[in-house]
Amino acid sequence: MTKLENPVLMATIGGAQGLRGEVRAKAYTADPTALGDYGLLHSTDGRSFEILEIREMKNVVVVRFRGINDRNAAEALNGLELYIERDNLPDEELEDDEFYYADLEGLEALDDKGVSYGTVTGVFDFGAGDLLELKGPGKRPVLIPFSEASVLEIDLEAGTLLIDPLAAGLVDDPELSQFTAGKPKKKK
């Protein structure tokens, strides 16, 4: 049984596929078939899973794990989330402007004046662009676009995001934000 220090969600198991113990899984990796390249996958209940075979099928991957040899065993895994340790992700493959979702969670969102808008509690991709979920103490969560206009700077070492609250949709009054999303300010 393994307890991960800094778990990163890599896949969610769906239904069984066929009779040999294969399962359909939704992989949260850029290359779904690379799921096996990260080593053992772990569930929150402490079990470890070794991938023996993996192939793509439509919007999912079909996976066969060591020790899962029939349909009944595969069906018992339905809905199981599989994780790896954050240290198993290759940092050297990231560009300067690329980040793992797991690294963004927990960062504090600040504007240029140091005002906090909460911490990142989730990162979502609904197809039209990534969204960051911010949650402040005593506040409801809000979603902001994870774009160059909204998120101006990311400092992983300091644990902060510099945001433009106007571009992020957190304020309505341009006077509350020094940034105007590239629009020139009117002279009086």
UniProtKB/Swiss-Prot annotation:
Keywords: Chaperone, Cytoplasm, Ribosome biogenesis, rRNA processing. InterPro entries: PRC-brl_dom, PRC_barrel-like_sf, RimM, RimM_N, RimM_N_sf, Transl_B-barrel_sf. Coiled coil: none annotated. It comes from the Bacteria. It is found in: Cytoplasm. The keyword Phosphoprotein does not apply. Residues 96-169 form the PRC barrel domain. NCBIfam families: 16S_RimM. Belongs to the RimM family. This is Ribosome maturation factor RimM. It comes from Rhizobium etli (strain ATCC 51251 / DSM 11541 / JCM 21823 / NBRC 15573 / CFN 42). The lineage of its organism: Bacteria, Pseudomonadati, Pseudomonadota, Alphaproteobacteria, Hyphomicrobiales. The gene is rimM.
